[in-house]
């Protein structure tokens, strides 16, 4: 909307400002709901991950004690990306988390459960990074 108005050399109209306000309000709602449910999202994601891949918690598995922290960090970065509408913060960290074996997909599944199920379409693209 902004780039289109700029290309035309126009100020934003009231309708365009209202549309932008609605987008920002939705993003704030998403971030607030994820933040409010972050502990449950990560707990449920970890539980699901370990049920699906019990070898992670077996001796020699990849479930180090900092795994929950890593999952929380991924979720925090998703909130940054959601509020900004820009997933580059996730792109910058993707290789690091993949190398560490951090289960971002499990956090994404956690968002899809419980009170956050309506947020899935809003944040799904950020978890695909």
UniProtKB/Swiss-Prot annotation:
It comes from the Bacteria. It is found in: Cellular thylakoid membrane. InterPro entries: Globin-like_sf (IPR009050), Phycobilisome_asu/bsu (IPR012128), Phycobilisome_asu/bsu_sf (IPR038719). Pfam families: Phycobilisome (PF00502). One of its GO terms (biological process) is photosynthesis. (2R,3E)-phycocyanobilin binds at residue 116. Two isomers exist. GO terms for cellular component: phycobilisome; plasma membrane-derived thylakoid membrane. The modification N4-methylasparagine is found at residue 62. It is a peripheral membrane protein. Keywords: Antenna complex, Bile pigment, Chromophore, Electron transport, Membrane, Methylation, Photosynthesis, Phycobilisome, Thylakoid, Transport. Light-harvesting photosynthetic bile pigment-protein from the phycobiliprotein complex (phycobilisome, PBS). Phycocyanin is the major phycobiliprotein in the PBS rod. Belongs to the phycobiliprotein family. Heterodimer of an alpha and a beta subunit, which further assembles into trimers and the trimers into hexamers. This is C-phycocyanin beta subunit. It comes from Aphanizomenon flos-aquae. The gene is cpcB.
């Amino acid at each position: 909307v902004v780039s289109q108005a700029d290309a035309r050399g126009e100020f934003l109209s009231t309708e365009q400002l209202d549309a932008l306000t609605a987008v920002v309000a939705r993003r704030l709602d998403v971030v607030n709901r994820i933040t409010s449910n972050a502990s449950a999202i990560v707990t449920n994601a970890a539980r699901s991950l370990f049920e699906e891949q019990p070898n992670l918690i077996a001796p020699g598995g990849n479930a180090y004690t900092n795994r929950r922290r890593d999952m929380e960090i991924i979720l925090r970065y998703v909130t940054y990306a959601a509020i900004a509408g820009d997933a580059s913060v996730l792109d910058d960290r993707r290789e690091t988390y993949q190398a560490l074996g951090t289960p971002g997909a499990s956090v994404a599944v956690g968002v899809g459960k419980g009170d956050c199920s309506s947020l899935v379409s809003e944040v799904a693209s950020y978890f695909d990074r």
